[in-house]
Structures are given as C-alpha cells and as structure tokens.
Amino acid sequence: MVKVEVLGMILAGGQGSRLYPLTAKRAKPAVPFGAKYRIIDFVLNNFVNSGIYAIYVLTQYKAQSLTEHIQRYWRFGAFLEDHFILLVPAQMYRYEELGPVWYRGTADAIYQNLHLVHNHAPKAVAVFGGDHIFKMNIRHMVEYHYDTRADITIAAYPVPVAEATRFGVLQVDEEWRITEFQEKPEEPKPIPGRPDTALASMGNYIFRTEALFELLEADARDETSAHDFGKDVIPRALREGYRVYAYDFHRNPIPGQEGPNLYWRDVGTLDAYYEASMDLVKVVPEFDLFNPEWPLRTANLFSPPAKFVHETGERVGRALNSLLAGGVIVSGGTVRESVLFRRVRVNSYSLVERSVLFDDVEVGRYCRIRNAIIDKNVKIPPHTEIGYDLELDRARGFTVTPEGVVVVPKGYRF
C-alpha cells in the first residue's frame, strides 16, 4: 500500500443507546443532523478540508445505513492511491490471538486494525470520534503535535470548572504538557493561570505511530484493561513517561471564520441532539453551515427546491427562522424555528414549532407540533397534536426526554 504522512482513523462503531429511538436501526454516527447531513459528515469534512485524505472508518453497531452513506457519497475515485475513505467493519481480524471477540473498546478497535497502520507507514495517526458536531482544522493540530515533539496530542476543550465533572479532565503544566488525567472528577483541577477553567478531553488524538503501536500492544496484553483510550491508554502513557500534550481547540483556525473556535457538541443524548439542532436555526447561529471556505459535503440526492404555497387568509405557506432541505413543501402551513429534512410536507393550517422532522415526514392538516423530533417515514393524521400533552405522547409509545422533547420513532403508524 502507498505511504502517507498522516493516517486518519475514525471510530464510528458507537451504539448510541442514549439516543434511542433514533439509534434503533442505525449507528450513532449515521443519525441525520442539520436538514441534510449525517453526524459522521462533520468529522469527515474536517479531515478532507484539512488536506488529510487517507481515512479509515471503523464500524460495528447497526452499520448498514452508515455503510451505504459513505460508500455512495464519499468517494475520491480510483486514480489517487493516497486518497481514500474506506470502511472497516469489526471482523475478528485477530481471531487467532484474541478469540471470537468484536471491538472491545475504542483502543481495541484500533489495535485490531494496526495492520492497516503498518501498511501505510504514516508519521502520525489521527484517531477521532465519529459522533460529534464541530469544525476543526486537523492539520493545525498535527503541526502542533510535531512542534511539541509529542508522542500523543489530545484535543482539549476549555470548560468552566463547574461543568468539567461530566468530562475527562486534563491537568497541564505551563507548556500544556499533560501531567494528570482525571475521569469525571468531583473536583476538577483548573488550567494554570485560569482558575475558573478546566480542560476537557474531546476524545480526539494524534499519535506518533511508534508510540501508538507500543501502547496498544501493551494494553492488549493487560487482562484488567477495558481497552479504552481515555480510561486505559492515556493513563498508561502518562505513567510510563510518554510526552502527552493538550491542544487548545479554541485556538484552532477555521478559514472564513473569525474569532476563536468555540463550537463542539457531543450529541450523545436526545436533549443534547435537540439543543444542537436548535442552535442551527438562530439568526446568528453558533454553528455556521454557510461558510464557503469550509464546505460541508454530504449526499447529493438531487432533490428539487423547497416550495411554499398558498396565501389566502390563515392558509399561508411559510417558514420562519428555520432550516429546510430540498424537496420540502410547506403547503399552507407554518414552520417556525425548526429543521426539516428532505421531502417533508406540512399541509394547510398546521403549525410546526421548534421541531426536527426527518426525511419523508408528512404533517396532515390542522396539526400542531412543538418540541419534537420525528424520525423518517411518519405520516401524521389531520388534527394531531404532538408536544402539547406529554402523557398522551407517552401513551402513544413516544419517548419524552427529561427536558420535555417528544421523539417519534421511525416509521410510526398512528
């Protein structure tokens, strides 16, 4: 195989149980987001926009829709050997050594595919999660990794100390070399000189290739290990004196974007997913989908334009402060602060507010929907209300989140 300088390895096998029912039939990275994308698209765009084109995507849980999406729409062609995005399903590649086991953790997923790393002989390996919403110039992080002569560089997100108990926290010295790793500590340690701020690990890593091999081979031999980067591999690296540095995500430069890079969301719960979706419909969104210098590629399905029809009395087709994909028809209804995916239809006299409607949802006449996430292929009968009577919504079998968001599963029939 052809040699590359930086090899990308994306961990996309997550079950995403806290996103159920959106993950009932798909992996977490395959969950739709932002009217036309899937969650995996954002990290893939980060690699491609950073000029890193040799990428493996490691899959495991309910990967069919994710596989189809990447195989169909993320293709470089056949003429550049160092330009590829290839799927790597869990396949018991080390069966003779480990026995009949699938990926046992994030570190084990990479360990079981070290032969791919060896084949490309990269200078550095970028191990990133496939389930976050963010923009990142990964090349800038790689250069920082080289400049510090690090064995491992961890992307870090500064957070208020009071919020840091939810994350793995990195303790650094004056040069941002990591001295300690705390997994969801009760009393997080702040950044030197910034007593109100702690460094949260984003779970994205750059490894010197030799260090990656050494650490993963040692971890595989450890029968007490959970084979997880955050819980096992990084603490081992610190104990054994490896040079481990933190990279300040806020200082990551994005072409066409002014100021610090502030937006990173782990959409690992239904409420977090909903909140991130609502971020997109603000007049000045925290996460900008419209930056031409940082294009966000995804499936090009050649949908027709969105369409708004009828303007008679109360029968007015309109959408306000919303994101609408191609093929949407708002036929005499009103859409406010919502995200509508492809081929959604909102019929006359209906109101959709602060909701996310996936592909091929149809809202009948005189419906009222608010604070809802409705998965694909749901036909809502006329005069239906969703999000107004939560006990009724629960009785229908819908999921109601702690924040009161109603989630209608894929293909639900009324």
Swiss-Prot record:
GO BP annotations, alphabetical order: glycogen biosynthetic process
GO molecular function: ATP binding; glucose-1-phosphate adenylyltransferase activity
Gene3D superfamilies, A to Z: Hexapeptide repeat proteins, Spore Coat Polysaccharide Biosynthesis Protein SpsA, Chain A
Enzyme class: transferase
The keyword Membrane is assigned to this record: no
Keywords from the UniProt entry: ATP-binding, Carbohydrate metabolism, Glycogen biosynthesis, Glycogen metabolism, Nucleotide-binding, Nucleotidyltransferase, Transferase
Pathway: Glycan biosynthesis; glycogen biosynthesis
Catalytic activity: alpha-D-glucose 1-phosphate + ATP + H(+) = ADP-alpha-D-glucose + diphosphate
Protein EC: 2.7.7.27
Annotated CDD domains: ADP_Glucose_PP, LbH_G1P_AT_C
Positions bound to alpha-D-glucose 1-phosphate: 103, 168, 183-184, 201
Signal peptide: none
HAMAP family for this protein: GlgC (MF_00624)
Oligomer status and interactors: Homotetramer.
Family membership: Belongs to the bacterial/plant glucose-1-phosphate adenylyltransferase family.
Function: Involved in the biosynthesis of ADP-glucose, a building block required for the elongation reactions to produce glycogen. Catalyzes the reaction between ATP and alpha-D-glucose 1-phosphate (G1P) to produce pyrophosphate and ADP-Glc.
Name the record gives this protein: Glucose-1-phosphate adenylyltransferase
